[in-house]
């Protein structure tokens, strides 16, 4: 199952899960983001049932980006029960993302 796409108005509801929620903040014009897309979808498959993997287009979520200080992308934020518990900025390695997810389980 690929990562889910969440909108700005559903963000707070999505991150409130008792399961860890990895949010990939990306943009259609961002080449590194495009390269990470398939990896993010792989993580969604590998962690299905354990972690919710979501994507948010930064061009459509200005207030969320401002709230979390997102200025560089790709930007990965990990939430648990609505609280940010991890962050990776401009990460391009699957194993680093997996380590972040594994620590949250």
Question: Language-model features: where?
Answer:
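Conserved redox-active cysteine motifs that mediate thiol-disulfide chemistry
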Residues: 25-42
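Conserved Rossmann-like nucleotide-binding pocket used by diverse enzymes
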Residues: 2, 26, 52-54
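Short pre-active-site segment immediately N-terminal to redox-active cysteine/selenocysteine motifs
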Residues: 18-19, 26-29, 72
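A short beta-strand-turn-helix
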Residues: 3-20
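Short acidic active-site motifs
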Residues: 10-11, 60-64, 96
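Structural micro-motif
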Residues: 62, 68-77
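Non-catalytic, surface beta->alpha helical segment in thiol-disulfide oxidoreductase systems
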Residues: 78-105
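Conserved helix-turn-beta segment immediately C-terminal to the redox Cys motif
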Residues: 18-20, 37-56
């Amino acid at each position: 199952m690929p990562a889910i796409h969440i909108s700005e108005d559903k963000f707070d509801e999505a991150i409130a899960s008792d399961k860890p929620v990895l949010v990939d903040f990306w943009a259609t014009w961002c080449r590194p983001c495009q390269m990470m897309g398939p990896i993010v979808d792989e993580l969604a498959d590998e962690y299905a049932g354990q972690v919710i993997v979501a994507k948010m287009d930064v061009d459509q979520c200005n207030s969320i980006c401002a709230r979390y200080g997102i200025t560089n992308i790709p930007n990965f934020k990990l939430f648990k029960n609505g609280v940010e518990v991890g962050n990776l900025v401009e990460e391009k390695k699957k194993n680093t993302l997996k380590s972040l997810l594994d620590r949250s389980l």
